[in-house]
Swiss-Prot record:
It comes from the Eukaryota. The keyword Cytoplasm applies. Transmembrane segments: none annotated. Tyrosine phosphorylated. It is found in: Cytoplasm, Cytoskeleton, Microtubule organizing center, Centrosome; Cell projection, Cilium; Cytoplasm, Cytoskeleton, Microtubule organizing center, Centrosome, Centriole; Cytoplasm, Cytoskeleton, Spindle pole. Belongs to the ODF2 family. Residues 13-124 form a coiled coil. It comes from Mesocricetus auratus (Golden hamster). This is Outer dense fiber protein 2. Self-associates. Associates with microtubules and forms a fibrillar structure partially linked to the microtubule network. Interacts through its C-terminus with PLK1. Interacts with ODF1. Interacts with MARK4; the interaction is required for localization of ODF2 to centrioles. Interacts with TSSK4. Interacts with AKNA. Interacts with QRICH2. Interacts with CFAP58. Interacts with BBOF1. Interacts with CCDC38. Interacts with CCDC42. One of its GO terms (cellular component) is sperm flagellum. One of its GO terms (biological process) is cell differentiation.
Length: 124
């Protein structure tokens, strides 16, 4: 064997070892990348679940806000209706008070007239 053959063989062996080391390093990096991918997939699933829960909360809050808005509108309508009824009752109350005062005044006038007539009858 010649020195050249031995050197070529040595270089080939070193190249082979270097390639094996590189392959090992690449396999290690691939395993780490696969592990990171699995971790990120789990994290993504957790985040997707969290997003779904938040969307459900938002839908629930929207429904509650809609219900509250409808209730508020209903209460405002009822308030307006009750205020109108109150104004009508106050007007009726005022009218009845005036009638009572007029009846009292009329009654007092009739009483005075009766007393005057009674005085006239006594004089006869």
């Amino acid at each position: 064997r010649t020195l050249r053959d031995l050197l070529r063989e040595q270089h080939s062996k070193e190249d082979s070892e270097r390639l094996m080391e590189q392959q090992g390093a690449l396999l290690k990096r691939l395993a780490e990348a696969d592990s990171e991918k699995a971790r990120l997939l789990l994290l993504l699933q957790d985040k997707d679940k969290e997003v779904e829960e938040l969307l459900q909360e938002i839908q629930c809050e929207k429904a509650q806000a809609k219900t509250a808005s409808e209730l508020s509108k209903s209460m405002e309508s009822m308030r307006g209706h009750l205020q109108a009824q109150l104004r009508c009752k106050e007007a009726e109350n005022s009218r009845l008070c005036m009638q009572i005062k007029n009846l009292e005044r009329s009654g007092n006038q009739h009483k005075a007239e009766v007393e005057a007539i009674m005085e006239q009858l006594k004089e006869l």
